[in-house]
């Protein structure tokens, strides 16, 4: 197969590993920076130009699109789909998962467990919003935040009101969620490929830090997940329409709660924590499921 990896940096661990595993299995692999692509959008003969070269004859595209370039990156991915190239994760599924509010609404529709979450637009609604999620402490999240940036733990009602009003004053869209104290600053990253959880790790936040993101100094370790956690992760990935996903769960007194479904999960943490060849598993799944023009939208909403 001829595989395109959409990534802005060929030296990133995840990109390197996908290239290595693709080449090891006899495939031709090319790393493409989506921001350097231009598109000829026609119904008869859609094309993508890259550094004055026309990209042709690709069988598969593996998107590794960062949150900051979601709009243009998914536009390029859609163009590949228009050309009949099989996407490991389709453009619609990625945009679903990148919209925190939309993704939570889709998960709620499927009956997936989540922290109680509130959303409002006006400062007048703040008292009702806090009451809705059970009062302080609460977690306040920017809808556009990634890697733990734009996430605040407000331990008192007064602090919560101040933070929410400040964000609203900046015209920022936010979610307010109940704080799951029993999680102890840890979460579970379940790596889903197809309809299976192929690896899982526990991420523990640094001392005094409630966010468990590895980018925020958290640590990762191998973990055994329960059948309920496995089912929840698979259901969450399917709700987004994602073939490859990192599903972040919190362990709570009422069962697993989904925090986020990541459409471009990093490979370094999960491979180091579990010792599994996750990149190879992605290529293996692609080999088994690839078909030309197999670009029909999965999932609904």
UniProtKB/Swiss-Prot annotation:
InterPro entries in the cross-refs: ATP-grasp (IPR011761), ATP-grasp_RimK-type (IPR013651), ATP_grasp_subdomain_1 (IPR013815), RimK (IPR023533), Rimk_N (IPR041107), Rp_bS6_RimK/Lys_biosynth_LsyX (IPR004666)
- Report the superkingdom from the record: Bacteria
Q: Name one GO molecular function term.
A: metal ion binding
Enzyme Commission numbers on file: 6.3.2.-
What does this protein need as cofactor?
Mg(2+); Mn(2+)
**Looking at the UniProt record for this protein, which Gene Ontology cellular component terms does it annotate, in alphabetical order?**
cytoplasm
Protein name from the UniProt record: Probable alpha-L-glutamate ligase
